[in-house]
Amino acid sequence: MYGHTEIQKKIQDKYDEIAALRKEQVAIAKSEGLSEVENYSFKDKNGNVVTLLDMFQSHDELIVVHNMGKSCPYCTLWADGLSSSTPHIQNRCGFALVSPNDYQTMSDFAANRDWKFPYYSGVETSFISDMGFSHQTEDGKVRYTPGFTTFLKKEDKIYRVACDLFGPGDLFSPIWPMMDMLHHSDKEWHPKFGY
């Protein structure tokens, strides 16, 4: 590729190992099998009620991103990146983002970021905690975790398929692997809302 064929072969071998490990990871994530979930209700950007079934649109599969809300620059980084991929994702399955912010806060923030995907407020539902993306701390505060859940629709029933977390260095934001290849890859960096 760039004149170091032995190095490139070693890199390709590692990619092959990573691909095999990723297959194992996906199999583990799906190993619980399908579990039926209720048809939760959310609010869209105008305050209208939208159900989980509605989010599938014309598809039988759905990806829901669990976003921690407008206060998290990391969640914003992932959402900004996913926004440009929305047409590709929606060609394959339903796609939406759910936030713990109220619908007006979420709507204002998403408009400011120019997000292209549908986004909903989950503030009046137990969906986020039921999916495992929030928990109560010892001091009584609610702590949110970012990630996504996949769903399958069979007739009018909804089944949870799998989930995964977002975090620095994950596979879901391409900037982390690219930054790893910088000379000073260990240099601490944090996303911001603006630069």
Regions found by a protein language model. Give the residues of each.
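Thiol/selenol-based redox catalytic cores and closely related redox-interacting motifs
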Residues: S121-Y195
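Short, charged, low-complexity amphipathic alpha-helix
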Residues: M1-D13
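N-terminal "domain-start" segment that seeds a small globular fold
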Residues: A19-M55
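Short active-site neighborhood of thiol/selenol oxidoreductases, capturing the structured segment around
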Residues: L52-P73
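A short acidic (Asp/Glu
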Residues: S107-A110, D130-M131
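Thiol-based oxidoreductase modules, predominantly thioredoxin-like and allied folds used
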Residues: I89-T105, K116-F127
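Conserved helix-turn-beta segment immediately C-terminal to the redox Cys motif
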Residues: K70, T76-L97
